[in-house]
Curated annotation (Swiss-Prot):
Pfam families: UPF0182. The keyword Cell membrane applies. This is UPF0182 protein MUL_2505. Keywords: Cell membrane, Membrane, Transmembrane, Transmembrane helix. The chain crosses the membrane at residues 18-38, 63-83, 113-133, 175-195, 210-230, 259-279, 287-307. The keyword Cell membrane applies. It comes from Mycobacterium ulcerans (strain Agy99). Residues 900-947 are annotated as: Disordered. It is found in: Cell membrane. PANTHER family: UPF0182 PROTEIN SLL1060. It is a multi-pass membrane protein. The lineage of its organism: Bacteria, Bacillati, Actinomycetota, Actinomycetes, Mycobacteriales. GO terms for cellular component: extracellular region; plasma membrane.
């Protein structure tokens, strides 16, 4: 029976078609409208920032990739459909029970819809997925050579970095396209009678056989190419159980030959498949495909497994030795740990040191860091917040400046930003939120090696940081008492101000000044932004676009927006850098600095690869996790890398948002490729000014990745490497409140890189022995401009206490625990241990330093402001302890050891300099007493003041309690010492409560 006439499908009425078109238009508008608005806003934003070429390059690249991939995949699928339809049988046997007939009728009635719509939809999806690989394609087009060849095939590493990923992507798309074309061809031939299934048998038309066999043959040929590319990918893969990344003995001697054999078999199978075009016998291609499958199981899987079990495992250390050496060399190259960067020196770690030797280490002992940036933020807030809407981040930053005596010092630094979440009541309405409270004010720095005075001193501010402030003062001029002069302390861009949704500010002259700036004793002074940053919202078109962008009608109706108005948005420094350099991975830390009298945010950018031959594959998230990152939820994305370079230093101006990218690594081939993709966006390294270079620091995340790798890859001998016997461990943070690895610390200390006593700014970390708590090494990375990036590793041979053992020894020392027990008695104060620093001192010795803080109450309440109360130290199992660095050093090494320390002395009389602002109440004085009791608590009244009998009696009791405390201390009687302290507390309370 011939094919029956095609039944006509019912037609839609004109009204129905119009309604459908309207509905489709609305859906398209809802889907595409926000994206079009976002694209237009991005175009404005990139243009204002001076990086419009980045926006257009990415957009054009993605569009072209989308177009090419969509046309390629959709075109191949369309060809499969079209060929099947055009070569369909003229007559198709049919009967009333044929289940295909109804589908055939539907397809024929909507032939264009199915014939064009299906390939178009597949092409659309393929294009959408493909455009996300624009990075891979740009690197293929612009990548160059590394100048290093792989040890197996002798190919330049640029092939693996830039070419191989593209070839793999192209092969994957061709494979998917041919497979989908095969499926489409099979379905079409089945619908139109080219394939007929009757009972247990079937029939193929000549056209169906030729087309399907050809497509299968092409798939087999693509598999042949895949086997060829798989050979190169062996060099960056990890076989289960190997202690290194890359091809091992089994891979080179079994898997690699197997790939070549399978490739040859695949070529033979492809020929067998294509033979069916002429021979008309499908058994031959079927046999070929079965042969390919069996070969892949036997040759590709079983044979390597046999070699692994019989030949390799019994002699693994010797068999893998050559390939471990390859991995050691490649990993050091890929992570910047080669001999021209890393210097190893033997260091005893337990050398004896005299007081004179310790005092001679002036660069170290005068810069011992007492302020822990993860603890002192509440003190910054208490003393320097000023207004409820100003705020400091929970973790502050460390930077260095030269003090007035031209000595290099490290400082805890912070920008006093505006935090929109802390606005209250009518401060939160749209006009105030976005046009009045627009910016922060001030750069705050505290010398990290000192505090205001001893916490138990008569003044109420002992133990708190000394604050050096650059801020807009009460008369509108800039008060520049900070560590460096600053012309503009207003902050419009920063991580805190952008930490809320819709972080935009509308600025510009539209009449009277609107932006809150500062207050005098009489009134509030406002300000108008004059910077170059911001996108104009003066026109009605712009106002409409941003009203849609932020879903805010006030853009259209508010009279505070005028022709000169601009909008500042995307104000997070890291996000701004990531937007203009989408190829960078940014460091989790961003810190403020004063450079050329401007406040800028500085952050580090990395270029990475994940297929560097033989280099260890590393998870950035795992490698950079430490107790700080976990506590503040700042973990990097879980990205796998086998190559990393700190290729870019970026700055973001805190006032106008200007983003500047500087080339840091002039040899990085990946950066060179991106500089060709986006010419002019990255400035050469020579453009880094000396003022900026003085504030660049070795990046923390890179250092953490490198120290984790140095734990293994410091080993030179491959047999020792295989045994893991000489591996190291990153120590856990010994602080009882921590839950991860000990973070590295920025310090100023004697120059490890130059091995002299000059002061150097460096990033340091201790390393433990493998699965033990004894020290194995001490790592220091220099941040000084002259030796920037040089890593020095002091290897420690003996059993020297690691951070955990040192912390245990300090916290369980009887004198320490007794004293802190008195201070924290009855939950009056919460004791907090600061960062445990490991410092080389003397001739081969290591000094552990741990500051001790206390805050009122038993918990971290909002009103609890930690202050430094003690300094604890350990050196060669001996403990030093006191209210100051000088006291602890003298107690540990003898008189004179602390002569070079930056001392803090009890302040005579009242409050010290830099008293807290008027609106900040002074915290309560700590009830505890240092080992050397204060000379007067509270301050003695002036001679002209006559005390009442009750106060005179209280003062007499105070003096008596102090004397008793001194006597108890000399005798070592801690019970009497505690009782004397309680008497002192009671006497002070009585003195304060009487008239």
């Amino acid at each position: 029976m011939g094919m029956r006439p095609t039944a006509r499908m019912p037609k839609l009425t004109r009204r129905s078609r119009v309604l459908i078109l309207i509905a489709l238009g609305v859906i398209a508008l809802l889907l595409a409208g926000p994206r079009l608005i976002d694209a237009y806003v991005d175009w404005l934003w990139f243009g204002e920032l001076g990086y419009l070429s980045v926006f257009t390059t990415v957009l054009v690249t993605r569009f072209l990739v989308f177009l090419v991939a969509g046309v390629l995949v959709g075109g191949i699928v369309f060809a499969g459909l079209a060929l099947a339809y055009r070569t369909r049988p003229v007559f198709v046997p049919n009967n009333d029970n044929d289940p295909v007939a109804r589908y055939r009728t539907v397809v024929l009635a909507r032939l264009r819809l199915f014939g064009i719509g299906i390939p178009a939809a597949i092409g659309l999806l393929a294009g959408i997925v493909a455009q996300s690989y624009w990075v891979r394609i740009q690197l293929f087009l612009h990548g160059g050579d590394f100048g290093i060849t792989d040890p197996q095939f002798g190919k330049d590493l640029g092939f693996y970095a830039f070419e191989l990923p593209f070839y793999r992507l192209l092969l994957s798309y061709l494979f998917v396209a041919i497979f989908l074309a095969f499926v489409a061809n099979v379905v079409s031939h089945y619908l139109f009678g080219g394939i007929r299934l009757t009972g247990r048998s079937g029939a193929l038309s000549r056209s169906a056989r030729i087309q399907l066999v050809s497509l299968v043959g092409v798939l087999v040929l693509l598999k042949t190419v895949a086997y060829w590319l798989n050979r190169y990918e062996l060099l960056s893969h990890t076989r289960g159980g190997k202690p290194f990344t890359g091809a091992g003995y089994t891979d080179i001697n079994a898997v690699l030959p197997a790939k070549l054999i399978l490739m040859a078999i695949a070529v033979i199978c492809a020929a067998a498949v294509f033979s069916a075009i002429v021979l008309r016998d499908l058994r031959i291609p079927a046999i070929g495909l079965v042969l390919l499958l069996l070969s892949s199981l036997i040759v590709g899987a079983a044979w390597p497994m046999i070699v692994e079990q019989i030949s390799v495992k019994p002699n693994a250390a010797q068999k893998e030795s050559e390939y471990i050496s390859r991995s050691i060399t490649a990993t050091r190259q890929a992570y910047g740990l080669t001999s021209n960067v890393v210097t190893y020196r033997n260091y005893t770690g337990d050398g004896e040191a005299t007081a004179q030797q310790v005092a001679a280490d002036r660069a170290t002992t005068s810069n011992i860091r007492l302020l822990d940036p993860t603890i002192v933020s509440p003190a910054f807030t208490q003393f320097q917040q000023g207004k409820n809407f100003y705020y400091f981040p929970d973790q502050l930053s460390i930077d260095r400046y030269f003090d007035r005596n031209n000595n290099l010092r490290d400082y805890v630094v912070a920008a006093r930003e505006l935090n929109p979440d802390r606005l209250i009541d009518n401060q939160r309405d749209w006009i105030n939120r976005h046009t009045v409270y627009t910016h922060g004010n001030g750069f705050i720095a505290s010398p990290a090696n000192t505090v205001r005075g001893i916490a138990n001193d008569p003044n109420q501010n002992g133990g708190y940081p000394e604050f050096l402030v650059n801020v807009v003062g009460a008369n509108g001029t800039v008060v520049s008492d900070g560590p460096a002069p600053l012309d503009q302390p207003r902050i419009y861009y920063g991580p805190v101000i952008s930490n809320t949704p819709a972080d935009y500010a509308i600025v510009g002259k539209t009449g009277a000044d609107r932006e809150y700036d500062y207050e005098t004793s009489a009134d509030t002074k406002n300000y108008t932004y004059t910077g170059s940053g911001g996108v104009s919202v003066g026109s009605w078109i712009s106002r409409t676009v941003f009203a849609a962008k932020f879903a805010e009608r006030n853009f259209l109706f508010s009279n505070v927006i005028g022709s000169n108005s601009k909008i500042l948005f995307n104000r997070d420094p890291a996000q701004r850098v990531e937007a203009v350099a989408p190829w960078l991975t940014t460091d989790s830390a961003v810190y403020p600095a004063i450079v050329n009298k401007r406040m800028v945010w500085i952050l580090d950018g990395y270029t990475t690869l994940d297929n560097y031959p033989y280099s260890q594959l590393t998870s950035l998230s795992s490698a950079t996790a430490d107790s700080n990152e976990v506590a503040f939820n700042r973990l990097l994305p879980d990205k796998q890398v086998s190559y990393i370079r700190n290729s870019v230093k970026a700055t973001v101006d805190a006032y106008d948002g200007t983003v500047t990218l500087y080339q840091q690594d002039e040899q990085d081939p990946v950066l060179k490729a991106w500089m060709q993709v986006f010419p002019g966006t990255v400035k050469p390294k020579g453009d880094i000014s000396p003022e900026l270079a003085a504030h660049l620091r070795y990046p923390e995340d890179l250092f953490k990745v490198q120290r984790m790798l140095l734990a293994k890859y410091h080993v030179n001998d491959p047999v020792t490497f295989f045994s893991t016997s000489d591996f190291w461990d990153v120590p856990l943070d010994p602080n009882p409140t921590a839950s991860s690895y000990q973070p590295p610390y920025y310090i100023v200390a004697k120059n490890i890189a130059k091995n002299d006593n000059s002061a150097s700014y460096q990033l340091i970390s201790a390393m433990n022995r493998f699965k033990r708590d004894y020290l194995a090494a001490y790592i220091s990375a220099s941040s000084d401009p002259a030796t920037y990036g040089k890593i020095t590793v002091l290897t420690i041979p003996g059993q020297v206490n690691g951070p955990k053992l040192a912390n245990n020894a300090i916290t369980t020392d009887p004198a320490v625990s007794q004293d802190l027990g008195v201070i924290g008695r009855d939950n009056q104060n919460r004791i907090r241990w600061g960062n445990l620093l490991t410092l080389p001192v003397g001739q081969g010795g290591l000094l552990y330093v741990e500051p001790v803080y206390a805050s009122p109450g038993a918990s971290d309440a909002a009103s609890s402001y930690p202050r430094l109360i003690r300094v604890a130290m350990m050196y060669n199992d001996k403990i030093g302890y006191g209210p100051t660095v000088r006291d602890a050093l003298n107690g540990l090494f003898g008189p004179g050891a602390g002569d070079a320390a930056t001392g803090i002395q009890p302040t005579e009389g009242g409050a010290p300099a830099n008293v807290p602002p008027n609106n900040a109440p002074s915290p309560e004085a700590l009830p505890g007493t240092p080992p050397s009791p204060p000379t007067a608590v509270p301050p003695a009244p002036e001679a002209s003041v006559t005390l009442s009998p009750a106060r005179a009696a209280a003062m007499k009791e105070i003096q008596s309690a102090i004397g008793a405390a001194r006597d108890a201390q000399k005798k070592g009687d801690f019970a009497a010492y505690g009782a004397a302290l309680q008497r002192l507390d009671d006497a002070i309370t009585k003195f304060n409560n009487t008239q």
